[in-house]
C-alpha cells in the first residue's frame, strides 16, 4: 500500500510532515510513502530512505491561492502531483496539510468521485466528553448547499467509516437539527430525516441539537456543509477559549490559586487531552475513489502520525471499495426495478 504525501503543505512543512511520516513508517511496515516536494528541504530530514521515495518539485499551492485556479495552473505543485499519482494508480491514498479548498478540488477533479455519490463530504472526528472515540460529522464545508439525498449519502458513507476505522459495530447516525422532534426543521431537514429513518442499513437515532453534540449521543452526525462548518468552528473556538481561560485564571492569580492549580493539574490535563483532536488525525473527504485526508495546517508530527494511521485503517479495511460496491449495488437494484 502506497501513500502520496504533499510534503510541502502546512505551516511547518516539510519538517512536521516528514517527522510524522517517519513515526508512522516504523509502525506500519506495510506502507510505502511517496513524498512530493523540494528534495533539498526533505532529504536532510531523513536518515533512512527505506520505503520512502522523493518526487522533487519546488512548486506548491499557498494557503491564499484560489483553489480551482491553483489546481489547474500549478500542474507541478506537490499537491497536484500527489493527487495525480493516486489517479494513475501509483499510490492508493493522499494526504495534505495544505490549502483545504485546493485539496477538495484536487480530490474532485483529479482523483474523481465515486459513481453514485452526488457530492463528496468533508468529515472530521471531533471529541466527546463521554467517549475516547469522539464522533464524526459531515459535511463540514465541502458543499455549502445540499439536498436531502446528499445528506442521506453522507450518513451511509459515515456509517462505513465508523465501522471500519473506528471499530463501531452498529454506529448511531443522527441529523443535526434545531430540535429533537421528527417534525423539526425546514423542508431539507424534514425530508432528510425521513430518508435516514427509512433506510434499513442505518441505525438512525433521530435529530440531535448542537448543544448535545459533545455528549456522545451519536457516532456520526449528518449536516449540510454551511451548518457543519459553522458548528465545527464554534466547537474548536470554544475549546480553545475555555482552556486558555483556565490557564490564565491559574497563572494570573495569587499563591493560593496557583497551589490549587497544581493540585488540579492532573484533572486539567485530562480535560486538555479529551479535547486534543490530534489523536483523531485529519478530516476525510468521503465520496472519492481513494482516501483523501486533510490535516490542519498547523498540525505537528503527532497529528501527521495519526493521519497516516487513519489512512492505514481505510486501506486495510478497503473502506472506499465498500462504498463503491454499495452504491454500485444500489444503482443496479434501481435499474432492475
UniProtKB/Swiss-Prot annotation:
Catalytic activity: a fatty acyl-[ACP] + phosphate = an acyl phosphate + holo-[ACP]
UniProt entry keywords in alphabetical sequence: Cytoplasm, Lipid biosynthesis, Lipid metabolism, Phospholipid biosynthesis, Phospholipid metabolism, Transferase
SUPFAM superfamilies the record matches: Isocitrate/Isopropylmalate dehydrogenase-like
Biological pathway: Lipid metabolism; phospholipid metabolism
Compartment annotation: Cytoplasm
UniProt cross-references to InterPro entries, sorted A to Z: FA_synthesis (IPR003664), Phospholipid_synth_PlsX-like (IPR012281)
Presence of the UniProt keyword Lipid metabolism in the record: yes
Pfam families recorded: FA_synthesis (PF02504)
E.C. number(s) listed in UniProt: 2.3.1.274
GO MF term set: phosphate:acyl-[acyl carrier protein] acyltransferase activity
Signal sequence extent: none
Function: Catalyzes the reversible formation of acyl-phosphate (acyl-PO(4)) from acyl-[acyl-carrier-protein] (acyl-ACP). This enzyme utilizes acyl-ACP as fatty acyl donor, but not acyl-CoA.
Homology family: Belongs to the PlsX family.
HAMAP family: PlsX
Known partners and oligomeric status: Homodimer. Probably interacts with PlsY.
Name this protein carries in UniProt: Phosphate acyltransferase
Organism: Latilactobacillus sakei subsp. sakei (strain 23K)
Amino acid at each position: 500500500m502506497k501513500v502520496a504525501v504533499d510534503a510541502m503543505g502546512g505551516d511547518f512543512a516539510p519538517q512536521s510532515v516528514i517527522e510524522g511520516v517517519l513515526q508512522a513508517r516504523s509502525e506500519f511496515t506495510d506502507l510505502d510513502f511517496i513524498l512530493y516536494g523540494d528534495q533539498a528541504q526533505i532529504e536532510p530530514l531523513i536518515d533512512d530512505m527505506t520505503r520512502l521515495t522523493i518526487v522533487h518539485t519546488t512548486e506548491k499551492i499557498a494557503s491564499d491561492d484560489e483553489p480551482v485556479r491553483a489546481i489547474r495552473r500549478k500542474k507541478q505543485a506537490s499537491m497536484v502531483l500527489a493527487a495525480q499519482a493516486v489517479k494513475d494508480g501509483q499510490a492508493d491514498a493522499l494526504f495534505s496539510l495544505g490549502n483545504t479548498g485546493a485539496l477538495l478540488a484536487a480530490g474532485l477533479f483529479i482523483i474523481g468521485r465515486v459513481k453514485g455519490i452526488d457530492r463528496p463530504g468533508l468529515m472530521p472526528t471531533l471529541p466527546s466528553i463521554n467517549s475516547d472515540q469522539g464522533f464524526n460529522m459531515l459535511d463540514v464545508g465541502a458543499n455549502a448547499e445540499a439536498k436531502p439525498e446528499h445528506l442521506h449519502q453522507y450518513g451511509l458513507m459515515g456509517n462505513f467509516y465508523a465501522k471500519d476505522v473506528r471499530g463501531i459495530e452498529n454506529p448511531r447516525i443522527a441529523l443535526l437539527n434545531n430540535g429533537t422532534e421528527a417534525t423539526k426543521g425546514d423542508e431539507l431537514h424534514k425530508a432528510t430525516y425521513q430518508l435516514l429513518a427509512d433506510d434499513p442499513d442505518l441505525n438512525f437515532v433521530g435529530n440531535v441539537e448542537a448543544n448535545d453534540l459533545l455528549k456522545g449521543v451519536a457516532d456520526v452526525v449528518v449536516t449540510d456543509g454551511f451548518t457543519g462548518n459553522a458548528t465545527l468552528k464554534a466547537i474548536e473556538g470554544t475549546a480553545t477559549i475555555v482552556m486558555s481561560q483556565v490557564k490564565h485564571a491559574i497563572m494570573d492569580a495569587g499563591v493560593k490559586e496557583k497551589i490549587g492549580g497544581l493540585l488540579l493539574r492532573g484533572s486539567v490535563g485530562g480535560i486538555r487531552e479529551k479535547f486534543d483532536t490530534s489523536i483523531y488525525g485529519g478530516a476525510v473527504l468521503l465520496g472519492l475513489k481513494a482516501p483523501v485526508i486533510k490535516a490542519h495546517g498547523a498540525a505537528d508530527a503527532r497529528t501527521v502520525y495519526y493521519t497516516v494511521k487513519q489512512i492505514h485503517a481505510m486501506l486495510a479495511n478497503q473502506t472506499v471499495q465498500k462504498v463503491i460496491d454499495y452504491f454500485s449495488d444500489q444503482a443496479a437494484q434501481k435499474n432492475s426495478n
